């Protein structure tokens, strides 16, 4: 009997801790989204070229660059030249966080 009570208390504690973690995780994702939508002044703006990477050539041919675009809160698009590896890593991270968030919400909801 004591074991069942202890298990029940552990489950209740675990559930409340998990719900707090999920709330924190959801707010963290929202913070990331709003942060990503904030536009900043650009030094290597390639918006006029969109995804045409001619504006992102490296004269020393040391790195490959991509024109990466986001849509800001105002609906305005902003594009910058970034290293290809950075853009690809960022996209993998975004997809991973999105999948984890969906799975957590699916399990809870």
Swiss-Prot record:
This protein's UniProt keywords: Amidation, Disulfide bond, Knottin, Neurotoxin, Secreted, Signal, Toxin
Gene Ontology CC entries for this record: extracellular region
Tissues where this protein is expressed: Expressed by the venom gland.
Residues annotated with Valine amide modification: 108
Propeptide residues per the UniProt entry: 20-37
Motif Processing quadruplet motif: chain residues: 34-37
Cited function: Insect toxin. Causes paralysis in larvae of C.vicina by depolarizing membranes at the neuromuscular junction.
Protein name: Latartoxin-2a
């Amino acid at each position: 009997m004591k074991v069942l009570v202890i298990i029940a208390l552990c489950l209740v504690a675990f559930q409340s801790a998990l719900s707090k973690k999920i709330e924190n995780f959801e707010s963290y994702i929202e913070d990331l989204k709003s942060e990503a939508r904030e536009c900043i002044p650009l030094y290597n703006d390639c918006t006029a070229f969109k995804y045409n990477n001619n504006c992102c050539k490296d004269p020393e041919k040391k790195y490959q660059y991509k024109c990466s675009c986001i849509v800001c809160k105002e609906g305005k698009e902003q594009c910058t030249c970034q290293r290809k590896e950075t853009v690809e890593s960022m996209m993998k991270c975004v997809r991973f966080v999105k999948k984890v968030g969906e799975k957590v919400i699916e399990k809870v909801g």
